[in-house]
């Protein structure tokens, strides 16, 4: 069993012996060692190049200030590829220390030359080729700087501000004044606050930050590379935001004015005319939309029929149309549509009591059914001379069938109604199971439904439908005008002087 290789399957290759397999092992082992050697050699060369690059970056970080120029990509690689810090010292919490995120980079210690490289490369804009930017180590001394292995090459900024590389930049503004060392009394609170190098060059000290909304917006875009900075979880109580958040905070006071302007856009003059508490144009400037809203009104037919007992307001109502709205009236006025159709050509219209208008909507013209009309006639003892109950259950007899037909014609505005037409309508109720014709007796009919159900359906809400009164004289079928002729005929356009103040005339055929 010792001679078998760990990957050999004996029954799959029966021709090979144990000795041959053992002799083939040294060749495989030599190949494996050769491959491993090549892999180790390649990886060593690869990582050797990376280590050389990293050493070059570290060497560049230790160059004196006047010769140092660190591009953006080098600062990114320095922070991302550098080993984690071994010792982290928590700084004192002061209001001025929250303005910068250099405390993240100061915790990296002496290995990086105390260069805050990442922050200033992301914050600073690209200078011209002839100028060299002011370097970030020109900050006040801090205990972290004093305890480091590599102290800053220059202790004060006024000496570094006089370097030849920074000479052309000094002509722009008073650079050394804001970067001078703080007084001894305030050094304990402001020692960890590095300042951006170009801030005194672009923002004078006497001008407020609110006057630079576009500059702050531009600085927020330049400081967006702060996102890849890895959060240091080892720092206790480190809840300070990143640097680009601090630089973009002056945008916040400038945000409410456009928001207020956006809310003010809703106060359109077209909307302000009806609001009682808002200033706006006078009401006469909005007459055209008011006229459109008045269009579906229904009182044009009532003004054309003078003898109809309409319950609409008339007279002085139309003269004050600018002060009131016509649709703010009683909703029961919209139940009437019975007095629109006249019955004579000469302008005589049927007289109609106003109680019919006060009823529920089922009493409108056309809604009263024939069986309901018959029950109403039977319920009134005054009609016993032409229709009455027979006394046998729900049977009733049309004593004068032509009179019943004539009254039904008055109710339905059909003066030519007769018993033949009425009897054909009654056959419809045979099929529906509402009434039947009593066999062997003429003009005798019978309701087949329950009496209580019959009267409850015929008189909803315990109110009897009001039937139309007798007309003055009999009319023929051809004497009745259709509704369309009535609307288009100018002979019926009466009381036009009362409607002159309205945007639309009453003669318009809707």
Swiss-Prot record:
GO terms for cellular component: nucleoplasm; nucleus; plasma membrane; synapse. Residues 132-245 are annotated as: Disordered. The keyword Nucleus applies. GO terms for molecular function: DNA-binding transcription activator activity, RNA polymerase II-specific; DNA-binding transcription factor activity; RNA polymerase II transcription regulatory region sequence-specific DNA binding; transcription cis-regulatory region binding. The modification Phosphoserine is found at residue 248. Coiled coil: none annotated. It is found in: Nucleus. Interacts (via C-terminal) with ZMYM5 (via N-terminal 120 amino acid region). Binds to DNA sequences containing the consensus nucleotide core sequence 5'-GGAA.-3'. This is ETS translocation variant 5. It comes from Mus musculus (Mouse).
């Amino acid at each position: 069993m010792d001679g078998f290789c760990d990957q050999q399957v004996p029954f799959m290759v029966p021709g090979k012996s144990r000795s041959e397999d053992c002799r083939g092992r040294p060749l495989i082992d030599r190949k494996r060692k050769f491959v491993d050697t090549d892999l180790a050699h390649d990886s060593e060369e690869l990582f050797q190049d990376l280590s050389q690059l990293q050493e070059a970056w570290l060497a560049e970080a230790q160059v004196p200030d006047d010769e140092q120029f660190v591009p953006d990509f080098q600062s990114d690689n320095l922070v991302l590829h550098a080993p984690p810090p071994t010792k982290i010292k928590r700084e004192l919490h002061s209001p001025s220390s929250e303005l910068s995120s250099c405390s993240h980079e100061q915790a990296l210690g002496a290995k990086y030359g105390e260069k805050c490289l990442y922050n200033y490369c992301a914050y600073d804009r690209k200078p011209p080729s002839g100028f060299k930017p002011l370097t970030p180590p020109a900050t006040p001394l801090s205990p972290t700087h004093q305890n480091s292995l590599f102290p800053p090459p220059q202790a004060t900024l006024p000496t570094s501000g006089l370097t030849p590389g920074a000479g052309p930049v000094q002509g722009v503004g008073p650079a050394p004044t804001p970067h001078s060392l703080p007084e001894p009394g305030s050094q304990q609170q402001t020692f960890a606050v590095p300042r951006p190098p170009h801030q005194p060059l672009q923002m004078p000290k006497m001008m407020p930050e609110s006057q630079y909304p576009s500059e702050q917006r531009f600085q927020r875009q330049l400081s967006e590379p702060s996102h890849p900075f890895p959060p240091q979880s080892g720092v206790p109580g480190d809840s300070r935001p990143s640097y680009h958040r601090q630089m973009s905070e002056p945008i916040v006071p400038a945000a409410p004015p456009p928001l207020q302007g956006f809310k003010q856009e809703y106060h359109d003059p077209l909307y302000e005319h009806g609001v009682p508490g808002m200033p706006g144009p006078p009401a006469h400037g909005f007459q055209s939309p008011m006229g459109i809203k008045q269009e579906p009104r229904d009182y044009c037919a009532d003004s054309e029929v003078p003898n109809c007992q309409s319950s609409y307001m008339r007279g002085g109502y139309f003269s004050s149309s600018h002060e009131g709205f016509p649709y703010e009236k009683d909703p029961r006025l919209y139940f009437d549509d019975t007095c629109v159709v006249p019955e004579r050509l000469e302008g005589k219209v049927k007289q109609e009591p106003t109680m019919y208008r006060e009823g529920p909507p089922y009493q409108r013209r056309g809604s009263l059914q024939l069986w309901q009309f018959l029950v109403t006639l039977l319920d009134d003892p005054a009609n016993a001379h032409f229709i009455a109950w027979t006394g046998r259950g729900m049977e009733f007899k049309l004593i004068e069938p032509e009179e019943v037909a004539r009254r039904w014609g008055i109710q339905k505005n059909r003066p030519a109604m007769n018993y033949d037409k009425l009897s054909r309508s009654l056959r419809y109720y045979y099929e529906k199971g509402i009434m039947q014709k009593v066999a062997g007796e003429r003009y005798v009919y019978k309701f087949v439904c329950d009496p209580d159900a019959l009267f409850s359906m015929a008189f909803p809400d315990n109110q009897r439908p009001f039937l139309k009164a007798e007309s003055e004289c009999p009319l023929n079928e051809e004497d009745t005008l259709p509704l369309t002729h009535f609307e288009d005929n100018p002979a019926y356009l009466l009381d036009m002087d009362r409607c002159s103040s309205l945007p639309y005339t009453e003669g318009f055929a809707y």
